[in-house]
Amino acid sequence: MKPKIFIDGEHGTTGLQIRTRLAERDDLEVISIPEAERRNKDLRADYLRAADIAILCLPDDASKEAVSLLEGHNSTRIIDTSTAHRVHPDWAYGFAELTKGQRERIAEARLVANPGCYPTGAIALVRPLRDAGLLPADYPVSVNAVSGYTGGGKQLIAQMEDRNHPDYLAANNFLYGLPLKHKHVPELQLHGRLDRRPIFSPSVGRFPQGMIVQVPLFLSELEGSPSLAKVHAVLTEHYAGQDIVDVVPLEESAKLPRVDAEELAGKDGMKLFVFGTEDHGQVNLVALLDNLGKGASGAAVQNMNLMLGK
């Protein structure tokens, strides 16, 4: 019997992307609630309970409600793409490449919290350095990032694309989260193994999909004042054998005149770069990904596959 997959919120940006990814799969049965009935709580509960895996593509409060509808129905496993459970100790963090054994934790879990798009890039850069002992736990980490506007969901998409929208945004790039209270920070701090709350400055560009995340560091403040090659080697070793995360060779990175945020749009991979100059003792770690790929829908499907033993 084919496993049943229910995408609760399949008509939203992330849900639609997941539905598209599963459309050609003949090894699954995707069960869908009619769009007109998506607010029917009792019917949603029936679909949730009928599924082998429920993928929640909902706002935080709605995700919490969906989880509550499954209380006492432990046969349904859950992947939550919201922020609601990413720092909850009972939920496996759905970043398969996070550390050794994480794939197995996801595969065996009933509850999986899909990572946020920005934290995916930032944690991919920070966590290996923490685990290797290069990055002190109390280092004052700063994360700068730009995302495609689809990361803001249907409302922001309309504001960026519809010139007749009452709140149309003409800006080609804008900063937000200005008070430094972005909801992704607790996740970034916990799974990045940081003692100090990192500074996170996100922005949105006038392009649909894509993302660049930057973590600049002073080499002299890292353990042993490592070289660029050493930092690169730590990342390379951490992601050795991974087919989704690619650490770009140092020599190749040194020849690049620029990094295009849209390079991986529509793809589920992630590229990591090490830039900098040892003359000034500075390194800039960069992650390149699709905010809707490895940053959302692609990761959800990857986690689903792991949970199904695929």
Swiss-Prot record:
- Reply yes or no: does the keyword NADP apply: yes
Q: Which SUPFAM superfamilies match?
A: Glyceraldehyde-3-phosphate dehydrogenase-like, C-terminal domain, NAD(P)-binding Rossmann-fold domains
Q: Does the keyword Zinc-finger apply?
A: no
What is the protein's major site of localization? cytoplasm
Instruction: Report which superkingdom the organism of origin falls in.
Output: Bacteria
Q: What do the Gene Ontology cellular component annotations say? A: cytoplasm
GO molecular function annotations of the record: N-acetyl-gamma-glutamyl-phosphate reductase activity; NAD binding
Which biological processes are named by the entry's GO terms?
L-arginine biosynthetic process
Q: What EC number(s) does the entry state?
A: 1.2.1.38
Q: SMART domains, per this entry?
A: Semialdhyde_dh
Q: Cite the Pfam families for this sequence.
A: Semialdhyde_dh, Semialdhyde_dhC_1
Which top EC class applies here?
Answer: oxidoreductase
Pathway assigned to this chain's UniProt record = Amino-acid biosynthesis; L-arginine biosynthesis; N(2)-acetyl-L-ornithine from L-glutamate: step 3/4
Family (UniProt): Belongs to the NAGSA dehydrogenase family. Type 2 subfamily.
Protein role: Catalyzes the NADPH-dependent reduction of N-acetyl-5-glutamyl phosphate to yield N-acetyl-L-glutamate 5-semialdehyde.
What is the name listed in the Swiss-Prot or TrEMBL entry for this protein? N-acetyl-gamma-glutamyl-phosphate reductase
Species this chain originates from = Brucella suis (strain ATCC 23445 / NCTC 10510)
